[in-house]
């Protein structure tokens, strides 16, 4: 009986050891997965892409030979936050395109998850609102994870440096999605203005407020 108790205690201890070590392995895998989806940080080089525009043509950052940088905005059709910002995004492009910082809008959502964000709907929305900038579709959802975009809208201000597109600002367009008249902090504008003046960007990162990116399950 004594030997049986010893065997049982050893068995229980072994089970406890297994239950203790397995979560540690799972947690490590989880952290690696999160890290792999982290995306760009300020100071990183943003790699170029080639995505389809609403006119059917393929667009890359390298197509904009005279650009000094870019205001890359991940946005979409259906999201109430994105809709609130549409007019402001148009104004950003009108204000800064001539100064070398055009807006490049990218729809990261899977249309099978959110049909309102389909390609044809993008064409119709751009025409309705009078978009003055490229509105690209992230087919296969390969670009938004590289950037680390998690919301629509989510802004990445880039500056050309020695032939590379360097991330200078990440986050929200401003600090009031609901009413442009109540905005007190113009994050994206301030970042671009600083770059135009040759000054460092003071606020390099803010929290993007919007709808989550709709990913195919």
Model regions and ranges:
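Bacterial Sec-dependent N-terminal signal peptides
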Residues: 1-32
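Second-shell loop/turn segments in exported
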Residues: 77-78, 108-113, 177-181
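Thiol-/selenol-based redox modules, centered on thioredoxin-like
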Residues: 157-217
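Short, internal strand/loop/helix patches
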Residues: 123-164
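Short active-site neighborhood of thiol/selenol oxidoreductases, capturing the structured segment around
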Residues: 62-83, 192
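Loop/turn elements at helix/coil->beta-strand transitions in domains of secreted/extracellular proteins
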Residues: 67-70, 98-103, 129-134, 152
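N-terminal "domain-start" segment that seeds a small globular fold
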Residues: 27-62
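Structural microenvironment flanking redox-active thiols in thiol-disulfide oxidoreductases
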Residues: 83-128, 139-146
